[in-house]
Amino acid sequence: MRLAIRHISRYQFDDQATHALQRLRLRPQSGPGQTVRAWQVTIEGVEPALSYTDGLGNRIDLVRHDRGAKNEIVVVAAGVVETQDRAGILGNPEGYAPPWIFERETELTKAGDTVRELTQALPIEPHSLDALHWLMTEVHGRIAYAPNLADAPVDAETALQSGEGTSRDHAHAFIAAARALKVPARYISGYVLADSAMQRIADAKQSAAGDEPEEALALQSGDGMQQALGASHAAQSQGLPQAALGAQPQAAALMQQPAGHAWAEAYVEGLGWVGFDPFMNRCPDERYVRIAVGLDYRDAQPVTGLGASAVGVEISVVQSPELV
């Protein structure tokens, strides 16, 4: 599938700020399941002061904005990515960080009593692929979609206790539980082509939480063991049926998640890294584009910095028949 993506972020200088510094994680990289055909990050009137690859393999741009006569900063990331459905399996691509790095707890993924209660309810062997599918389904059912939560992330324990959150919180809860089971797990930020299944889940989660659905933003080869595990996993990884993409000249409305979409990946012996989207209760397929990876949201946040505050984000993901 060929996806055309456009991500526009707007910021205003803070009072008294003479300049702003930003770290951008807005460049997808080619790898298992995705090939970047064209991509550009444009910052009005500014060139990145430094671009590099961090210790987790993310492409980073560092930018300084001098206030001058302007009060707004506009950052545009756009391009075309070709994707393949690998049933969520990335395998063991060459990378910067070994799997054991992602067993480490963070403030946002620390296992408390609620996370441990979830892992203790696991009915099967904890290091199996089936256990991770069970965990994904449990997190999906325990956290209702709440698009109007504050932008500041909450930790996994709080998300499970409150029973509401966004895809970011679903990912943190899954990661915390997986790490409590001694399974390496990491946070992924990226984009997803929304479909009717995604909208139905958002509506159902809102209804279950007692909220009225709100108007969404219109944005948005291995050895024998690996092959056998992969075949079993592929049968489990299918989510709700996808709407006919050919009938969607524009992307379906993506729920109000200002930073795009988030999911998790866990390391499975014999398969390598495997993606799990507990928000959608499915494994990532050709509708997903990975942008950044981290121990949690803070490592993979699209834009961080000082001296300016976000005032608006627009994200569109559209199936494209040609390069744009």
Regions found by a protein language model. Name each.
Residues 12, 16, 23-25, 101, ...:
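Residue-level preference for alpha-helix termini and adjacent loops
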Residues 24-26, 41-43, 77, 119, ...:
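Generic structural hydrophobic/aromatic packing signal, biased to beta-strands
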Residues 137, 169-312:
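Hydrophobic/aromatic-rich core segments of domains that either
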